[in-house]
UniProtKB/Swiss-Prot annotation:
Entry-linked NCBIfam families: KDO8P_synth, PRK05198.1
Gene name in the database record: kdsA
Name under which the protein is recorded: 2-dehydro-3-deoxyphosphooctonate aldolase
Origin organism lineage: Bacteria, Pseudomonadati, Pseudomonadota, Alphaproteobacteria, Hyphomicrobiales
Endpoints of the signal sequence: none
GO cellular component annotations of the record: cytosol
């Protein structure tokens, strides 16, 4: 893993590169880890798509959705069951793996099984969590809080780099806009790149989430995922984060904003075309 200190930093995980001036790479997978079989099936399908399209892929999923709307909502398989599955995906499929951490005490253990530690948006200012993630030496992907201006993320990134870890990604996932609503300000993408000096990821699926919008769960408008993803790629980003599932409507979490797996390849093809035009204008 490496990160340059030039105006166009690059974070590398194996053969996957994230750079604001490079062709986009993709972070994709289901919202939460549902079972070993489900994870391997989705990861295998995504790997095949990435190979056909010749695009960098990081597999993502969560062992614990710690901020569910309802106390009774499914949260995932938990740390003990999930880490061996993460390790198997890395070893058997050769895919880099991303998962989120919620407590500083989780970071060292989780880092043994994954390539990227993700800091959830609601926790992006938690200094102890950021420092613990940075101390692992792994790539740290920090989601911008829905309550922050893009330039506020400069302080967040500095907390990580102050621990001698330059391997940072920052992810835009929308800003709070009234009750149960997020809005994506595309100006945030170049501002994040300029003020943080990090590769910028656009989270196309959580940006269409309606937090708490269904009473005991969050709603979403997945029909707008392609629209926002195309807009972000046209502006210019290092990568796109897309949650996908074979049957989103039966998923235990974030179903309303996940992309059906059968639609994933077509979406990525279109995004690659927009990306090529944005970064190689004629």
């Amino acid at each position: 893993m490496s990160s340059s200190t030039s105006a166009a930093p690059v974070v590398t995980i194996g053969r996957v590169k994230f750079g604001n001036d490079l062709p986009i790479s993709i972070i994709a997978g289901p919202c939460q880890l549902e079972s070993r079989q489900h994870a391997l099936e989705v990861a295998s399908a995504l790997k095949e798509i990435a190979a056909r399209l010749n695009i960098g892929l990081v597999y993502k999923t969560s062992f614990d959705k710690a901020n569910r709307t309802s106390a009774s909502a499914a949260r995932g398989l938990g740390l003990a069951q999930s880490l061996p599955i993460f390790a198997e995906i890395r070893s058997s499929l050769g895919l880099p793996v991303l998962t989120d951490v919620h407590e500083a005490t989780q970071c060292a253990e989780v880092a043994q099984a994954v390539d990227i530690l993700q800091i959830p948006a609601f926790l992006c200012r938690q200094t102890d969590l950021l420092l613990a993630a940075a101390a692992t030496g792994k790539v740290v992907n920090v989601k911008k809080g829905q309550f922050l201006a893009p330039w506020d993320m400069a302080n967040v990134v500095t907390k990580i780099t102050s621990a001698n870890n330059p391997n940072v990604l920052v992810t835009e996932r929308g800003a709070s806009f009234g009750y149960n609503t997020l809005v994506s300000d595309m100006r945030a993408l170049p501002i994040l790149a300029r003020t943080t000096g990090a590769p910028v990821i656009f989270d196309a699926t959580h940006s269409v989430q309606q937090p708490g919008g269904k009473g005991t769960s969050s709603g979403g408008e997945r029909e707008f995922v392609p629209v926002l993803a195309r807009a972000a790629v046209a502006v210019g980003v290092a990568g796109v984060f897309i949650e996908t599932h074979p049957d989103p409507d039966s998923a235990p979490s974030d179903g309303p904003n996940m992309v059906p797996l059968r639609e994933f390849e077509g979406l990525i093809r279109r995004l690659m075309a927009f990306d090529a035009l944005a970064k190689n204008p004629r």
